[in-house]
From Swiss-Prot:
Enzyme Commission number: 4.2.1.126
Miscellaneous information on this protein: A lyase-type mechanism (elimination/hydration) is suggested for the cleavage of the lactyl ether bond of MurNAc 6-phosphate, with the formation of an alpha,beta-unsaturated aldehyde intermediate with (E)-stereochemistry, followed by the syn addition of water to give product.
Species in which this protein is naturally found: Enterococcus faecalis (strain ATCC 700802 / V583)
Similarity section: Belongs to the GCKR-like family. MurNAc-6-P etherase subfamily.
Listed name of the protein: N-acetylmuramic acid 6-phosphate etherase 1
Lineage of origin: Bacteria, Bacillati, Bacillota, Bacilli, Lactobacillales
PANTHER family, per the entry: GLUCOKINASE REGULATORY PROTEIN
């Protein structure tokens, strides 16, 4: 049987003095209060930028060597992790096997609450064991409270295996922050609605994860200048986006960009190298392989 969790003293569970009368104000006043509280999120993120940068550097090194990004969490936190992982495939051509989310309660938990799942430390071990966690991998455990048993256990098991462990929470001095190799804890203060951590805490977690995964993609060469050069052009909109990226990066006409995209078999990065270095597709692929996919180094 699980011990009852003590929520006293958690910033995310405290009452917000500024919103105690939110049920008595006009709709405009209500959304103004929410907006004022939301502005505190970016300020909280600013204070943990060094930790986010450290997490990016450490995780990128593992990822370059074949390691995986494994996001673990329950409820909103777990869903945010899964969302971050899912988006890396269409945006940066990262294989779903290289970045994925594990939710307490399984795939059904993406759409509905699975009672008791977040309280099971054994379930986290089972899930990570099923995915054959190794020392090359990165475990990103996410929980607003910083003490959800499932997420705590994910860190504990990750450390036992030798994986890099990163926690994303919104409470200082939490078990997760103390256990993880790198702890990221933006303190956003009490929620607008007491304990509703899908609000400010969820927004903070989303911003941290956006920075984290984007930073890794920059480090591994999936971004040139500020262009997503490994986007998968799987539909008409994305084919046009890919064409525009090549046009911008190579400073050529749209018609030429389309020709290079076709010649590069719809791969954006080789198309840019072909256009700027005046080489064929195979040579462009070779050059990218020799420089870890970083176009800026190929063209230096």
């Amino acid at each position: 049987m699980c011990k009852q969790m003590n929520l006293e003293g958690l910033t995310t569970e405290a009452r917000n003095e500024a919103t105690k009368k939110i049920d008595q104000v006009s709709t405009l006043e209500m959304v103004t209060l929410i907006n004022q509280e939301d502005q505190k999120v970016a300020q909280a993120i600013e204070k943990v930028l060094p930790q986010i940068a450290a997490a990016i550097d450490a995780a990128a090194e593992r990822f370059k060597k074949g390691g995986r990004l494994i996001y673990c969490g329950a409820g909103t936190s777990g869903r945010l992790g899964a969302l971050d992982a899912i988006e890396l495939t269409p945006t940066y051509s990262v294989s779903p096997e290289r970045a994925f989310g594990i939710l307490a309660g399984g795939e059904k938990a993406m759409y509905q609450a699975i009672e008791g799942a977040e309280d099971s430390k054994e379930l986290a071990i089972e899930d990570l064991t099923q995915h054959q966690l190794t020392a090359r991998d990165v475990v990103i455990a996410i929980a607003a409270s910083g003490r959800t048993p499932y997420a705590v256990s994910a860190i504990e098991y990750g450390k036992k295996v030798g994986a890099l462990t990163i926690s994303v929470t919104c409470n200082n001095q939490s078990p997760m922050n103390q256990l993880a190799e790198i702890g990221i804890a933006p303190i956003v203060g009490p929620e607008v609605i007491t304990g509703s951590t899908r609000m400010k805490a969820g927004s903070a977690q989303k911003m941290v994860l956006n920075m984290f995964s984007t930073g890794i993609m920059v480090k591994v060469g999936n971004i040139y200048q500020n262009l997503m050069v490994n986007v998968q052009p799987t539909n008409e909109k994305l084919i046009q986006r890919a064409t525009n990226i090549i046009k911008e990066a190579a400073e050529i006409e749209e018609s030429q960009a389309k020709e290079y995209l076709e010649a590069a078999q719809l791969e954006v990065a080789p198309a840019i190298v072909m256009a700027k270095a005046h080489v064929d597709f195979q040579k462009a692929k070779q050059l990218l392989a020799e420089h870890d996919g970083r176009i800026s180094e190929v063209l230096a």
